Swiss-Prot record:
One Pfam family matching this protein: LplA-B_cat
Function (record text): Catalyzes the transfer of endogenously produced octanoic acid from octanoyl-acyl-carrier-protein onto the lipoyl domains of lipoate-dependent enzymes. Lipoyl-ACP can also act as a substrate although octanoyl-ACP is likely to be the physiological substrate.
GO cellular component: cytoplasm
Organism: Synechocystis sp. (strain ATCC 27184 / PCC 6803 / Kazusa)
Keyword Acyltransferase attributed: yes
Alphabetical list of InterPro entries matching this protein: aa-tRNA-synth_II/BPL/LPL, BPL_LPL_catalytic, Octanoyltransferase, Octanoyltransferase_CS
SUPFAM superfamilies: Class II aaRS and biotin synthetases
Name of this chain's protein: Octanoyltransferase
Keywords tagged on the record: Acyltransferase, Cytoplasm, Transferase
Record gene name: lipB
Pathway this chain belongs to: Protein modification; protein lipoylation via endogenous pathway; protein N(6)-(lipoyl)lysine from octanoyl-[acyl-carrier-protein]: step 1/2
Amino acid sequence: MANPSCRLLSFGLVPYCQAWQYQRRWVRAKQRDRQREDGLMLLEHPPVYTLGTGSQTKYLKFDPAYPPAELWRTERGGEVTYHCPGQLVGYPILDLNHFQKDLHWYLRQLEEVLIITLEKLDLQGERIAGLTGVWLEGHKVAAIAIKVSGWVTCHGFALNICPDLEGFSHIVPCGIGDRPVGSLNQFLPGLTVEIVQPLVIQAFAEVFPVTWIATGEMPCWLSDDVA
């Protein structure tokens, strides 16, 4: 069986609400037409806090009526997290019928993408039993939270490469208060999103066998309101 086609889109800096809209359009398009290609969106966000469907406000260290940056509640799983420039965010839109219809398997595969990425930098990423994400010498460097509808995925992962970590001080990231957040740049100074992103793309294709569609152009069905 041929590998599924996967459109690769690299956006740069994108407001959270816009990227969320792209995801929802893509998921709807795939649910209407299962032949529509899978996708991977890679981007950065301006400073923003996001909550999952069941996120508890006790993990916020600020009044949600007066957040220090934008605050959104989304349909993903997980607790509060923070996005900002210097953090590479990946939103895979995958039909798990092409791979394995198992959410726990999918979460572990996303972790594997990031662990392989770190290996390419001679960094030893690791999992922690009972938790989701990737750690480096005890510091959480990657967060993962997903939404799956009709076996089509959205939301995804956030890899801290060279962000300003101060924004994390206003929350209990992912509801985990006893483990610090870190960035790759702390362990390998000089890293940038531009350096790491190609490694993430390589690692993604190693974990999820796909045939890339890398036109660099936004498809009309994704950008148009009619999508």
